[in-house]
Amino acid sequence: MGRLLPRHLEIIYQINDLFLESVKKQFPDDTDLLRRISFIEENDHKQIRMPYLSIVGSHTINGVAELHTELLKTTVFKDFYKLFPERFQNKTNGITPRLWLRNVNPELSKIITAKIGDGWITELQQLRQLEAFADDPEFQQSWRSVKRLKKEQLANWLKQNSGISIDPESLFDVQIKRIHEYKRQLLNILHVIYLYNQMLEHPELPFVSRTFLFGGKAAPGYFMAKLIINLANDVARVVNHDPAMQDRLKVVFVPNYNVSVAEKMIPATDISQHISTAGTEASGTGNMKFILNGALILGTMDGANIEIAEEVGAENIFTFGMSSDEVSSLAKSGY
């Protein structure tokens, strides 16, 4: 950096010096604090701590979910929170219902608007009015009909574009997101393997017919993520070629996943998996898109899942696993 951008580096050093001098006046005896908050990483190859530079140069630091904001304050940037507590705010990520409901699922939008009007398009809280129709058999049937239609549309699209056949009568269990170890697609795959073995060992049990749909891409150099994709396809190959699994269990890794594909998959989903290790997902917005389209969330208490659970009620979301604090305690105990 010094060779390519010498003046930029000089300015960064100047800002760092001024910042450290101001902190030194507040905490004259805490030299370790100065070392921790310096923009310069002092090791064999000096590096610029860009997040620190950003914090000092910003009037506001936003977390993107309540848990994420709390982690920023107590762990990631706790020294800076001590210096600038007024700068740290929470701004939970969000999505636009114009795209992720009205545009991708016009059929569901139509039956919602028929009941409560179209004010929900710009004031999403108006969807709470639907609670009055939760036990209405006619509305329930309309909702089920839309879900079935979107599943048929996805099945037809997959058949036409990838030659893959899936049964719209089965439960669509979906995990679509960037492939990463912390997002735990591997955990989902292990569950598929477990379910497959259980079906083989106990064919008499009344298992619900289920289609597992995976989608996502790995970073070019992320070897482990590519192994996870490989494993998912290998498991799909075994399960889908087993005659005993006919009409009972199917596994599909949807090729060439992108936003356009997501627009087809999300309205068709029955169960949506958001199972990151607690404390690792900043927020996530896929969970919001799925629940807006009537899917049930299976997830950990991480990111925006926590706030979704508070909003919809614990009885309307499937959660499991450790909390962020429990994960942290386990890590500190030498796990």
Language model features with spans:
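A conserved ligand/cofactor-binding region detector
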Residues: 1-335
